[in-house]
C-alpha cells in the first residue's frame, strides 16, 4: 500500500461521530476523505468544511455532508497534508495552491493533524519552494518586495498560464538559498508586504503529525 494511503487512512480513525471537521487538500488528504466517505456510508455522522473546490467536489461525490465555516464557531479537527514538516511540527503547505483556505480552516480548528509520507520530513524547512499567495494587482511590485528578503521567485503557472487560486489570487513560489532557519520570523516579514495575502508557512498550528513510513505509522 502507498505510504500516503497508509497515513491518510489511519488519520481518518481520529474522526468520531458528531464531529465537525476540516477536510484538507492534496494527494494524502485524498485518502483520508475516501476513508471518511466509506465510514459515512457505514453510518458515521459528521459535518465537514472543505479547504478547496477540489476537495468540495470529492466530498460531494462521496456524500460527506458539507457545511460553511460561517455557520459554526469552531471545528473539532482538521486533517491535511504538507509539503514539508520539521521536528517542531512547522510546515510548508500550498503545493496544491489551497494554502489560504487551508490556513483559515486549520486556524478555526481545535486540533490540526498533518499527514505525510516520510519523504516530507526535513531537518530544516525550505528545500520545497515556499508558496506565497498574492493579489494580482501590481503583482510584479509585490514580487520585487518578496525578492528583497533574499529569495529567488517564480510565478506559478498551470498549463502555461498563470495559476489562479480558488480566491482568484496568484502564487509566487520562493526558494531561499540557506533554507528557512526561523519560519515564524519569515512569515511575519512576508505578511508585512502589501499585496501578500498569506504564506505557506504554518507555525504553532499542528497538534500531531502522522507519518507513513516503510516500517508503518509514526506519530510526532
UniProtKB/Swiss-Prot annotation:
Active site: 102 (proton acceptor)
Biological process according to GO: pentose-phosphate shunt, non-oxidative branch
Gene of this entry: rpiA
Function per UniProt: Catalyzes the reversible conversion of ribose-5-phosphate to ribulose 5-phosphate.
Family the UniProt entry places it in: Belongs to the ribose 5-phosphate isomerase family.
Disulfide bridge positions per record: none
UniProt protein name: Ribose-5-phosphate isomerase A
InterPro entries per UniProt: NagB/RpiA_transferase-like, Ribose-5P_isomerase, Ribose5P_isomerase_typA_subgr, Ribose5P_isomerase_type_A
Keywords, ordered alphabetically: Isomerase
HAMAP family hit by this protein: Rib_5P_isom_A
Amino acid at each position: 500500500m502507498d505510504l500516503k494511503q497508509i497515513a491518510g487512512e489511519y488519520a481518518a480513525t481520529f474522526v468520531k461521530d458528531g464531529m465537525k471537521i476540516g477536510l484538507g487538500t492534496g494527494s494524502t488528504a485524498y485518502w483520508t476523505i475516501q476513508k471518511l466517505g466509506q465510514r459515512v456510508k457505514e453510518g458515521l455522522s459528521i459535518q465537514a468544511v472543505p479547504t478547496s473546490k477540489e476537495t468540495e467536489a470529492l466530498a460531494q461525490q462521496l456524500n460527506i455532508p458539507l457545511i460553511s465555516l460561517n455557520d459554526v464557531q469552531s471545528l473539532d479537527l482538521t486533517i491535511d497534508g504538507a509539503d514539508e514538516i520539521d521536528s517542531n511540527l512547522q510546515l510548508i503547505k500550498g503545493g496544491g495552491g489551497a494554502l489560504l483556505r487551508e490556513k483559515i480552516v486549520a486556524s478555526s480548528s481545535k486540533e490540526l493533524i498533518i499527514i505525510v509520507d516520510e519523504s516530507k520530513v526535513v531537518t530544516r524547512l525550505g528545500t520545497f519552494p515556499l508558496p506565497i499567495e498574492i493579489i494580482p494587482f501590481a503583482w510584479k511590485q509585490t514580487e520585487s518586495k518578496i525578492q528583497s528578503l533574499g529569495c529567488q521567485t517564480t510565478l506559478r503557472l498551470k498549463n502555461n498560464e498563470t495559476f489562479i487560486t480558488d480566491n482568484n489570487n496568484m502564487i509566487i513560489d520562493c526558494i531561499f538559498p540557506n533554507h528557512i532557519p526561523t519560519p515564524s520570523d519569515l512569515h511575519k516579514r512576508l505578511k508585512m508586504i502589501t499585496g501578500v495575502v498569506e504564506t505557506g508557512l504554518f507555525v504553532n498550528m499542528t497538534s500531531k503529525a502522522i507519518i507513513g513510513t516503510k516500517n508503518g505509522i509514526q506519530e510526532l
